[in-house]
């Protein structure tokens, strides 16, 4: 299996990050087999499109919640990486566990 799991919808609370907020998070490598997708459907035209990264962020967005890493945006990029036999993906990772822990301590 390419991903750790596939589910429909976000199990974590809304984080409210804008694209500008996401752009401030530096990309890092994430193993594909550690990701759980939150989308069950992939638009084949986005997967095959040469300019699918023309709009939006060049890096997928992932969220860690309760120790699990969820792929929030960029499923087509992750599948494309897997089709090229890559095991990792560069993505922006929001650690909601750390944000929640920090808020609880404040």
Question: In which residue ranges do the predicted regions lie?
Answer:
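Hydrophobic transmembrane signal anchors and adjacent membrane-proximal interface regions, especially
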Residues: 3-5, 27-32, 36-38, 83, ...
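A short, basic-hydrophobic beta/loop patch
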Residues: 56-106
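N-terminal leader/domain-start detector
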Residues: 1-21
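Short alpha-helix boundary/capping and kink motifs at helix termini
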Residues: 15-70, 82
């Amino acid at each position: 299996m390419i991903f750790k799991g596939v589910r429909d919808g976000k199990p974590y609370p809304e984080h409210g990050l804008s694209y500008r907020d996401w752009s401030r998070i530096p990309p890092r490598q994430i193993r594909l087999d550690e990701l759980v997708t939150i989308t069950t459907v992939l638009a084949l035209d986005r997967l095959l499109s040469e300019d699918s990264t023309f709009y939006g962020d060049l890096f997928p967005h992932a969220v860690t919640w309760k120790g699990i890493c969820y792929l929030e945006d960029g499923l087509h990029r992750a599948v494309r990486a897997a089709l090229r036999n890559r095991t990792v993906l560069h993505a922006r990772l929001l650690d909601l566990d750390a944000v929640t822990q920090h808020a609880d301590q404040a």
